[in-house]
C-alpha cells in the first residue's frame, strides 16, 4: 500500500510569525464550531506554528479572553433562541 503524503501548501504566515494570546479576534480563526482547536491539516499550519497557536489559545482561555468549553460555542442554546414567554397550560 502506498503511504499517503500531505501535499505542499502555501504558508499564510511566515515562519517567525507571533500568535499573540492577547488578540482573541485573530485566534478565533483557529477554533472550530465546537470550541476545539482546528488541526494543522485544516488550518494549513506547520508543526511549530500549530504548537504556538495551541499554546496561545490555551493561554488566552486561561485568562478568560476566549471562552472555554463547548457550551460557549453552541448556537442552539443561546439566550435569543429561547422564548422569554413561560409555558402555559
UniProtKB/Swiss-Prot annotation:
The chain's coiled-coil residues are: none
What InterPro entries does the entry give?
A: Ribosomal_bS18, Ribosomal_bS18_sf
One record GO biological process: translation
What's one GO MF term for it? small ribosomal subunit rRNA binding
| UniProt keyword terms in alphabetical order | Ribonucleoprotein, Ribosomal protein, RNA-binding, rRNA-binding
Recorded GO cellular component terms are: ribonucleoprotein complex; ribosome
| UniProt keyword ATP-binding present | no
Q: Which Pfam families match?
A: Ribosomal_S18 (PF01084)
Judging by the UniProt lineage, the source's domain of life is Bacteria
* Family label: Belongs to the bacterial ribosomal protein bS18 family.
Q: What does this protein do?
A: Binds as a heterodimer with protein bS6 to the central domain of the 16S rRNA, where it helps stabilize the platform of the 30S subunit.
Q: How does it assemble?
A: Part of the 30S ribosomal subunit. Forms a tight heterodimer with protein bS6.
Protein name (Swiss-Prot/TrEMBL): Small ribosomal subunit protein bS18
Organism encoding this protein? Bdellovibrio bacteriovorus (strain ATCC 15356 / DSM 50701 / NCIMB 9529 / HD100)
Amino acid at each position: 500500500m502506498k503511504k499517503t503524503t500531505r501535499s505542499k501548501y502555501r504558508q499564510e504566515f511566515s515562519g517567525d510569525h507571533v500568535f499573540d494570546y492577547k488578540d482573541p479576534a485573530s485566534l478565533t480563526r483557529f477554533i472550530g464550531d465546537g470550541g476545539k482547536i482546528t488541526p494543522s491539516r485544516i488550518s494549513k499550519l506547520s508543526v511549530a506554528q500549530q504548537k504556538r497557536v495551541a499554546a496561545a489559545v490555551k493561554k488566552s482561555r486561561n485568562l478568560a479572553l476566549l471562552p472555554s468549553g463547548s457550551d460557549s460555542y453552541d448556537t442552539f442554546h443561546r439566550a435569543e433562541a429561547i422564548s422569554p414567554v413561560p409555558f402555559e397550560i
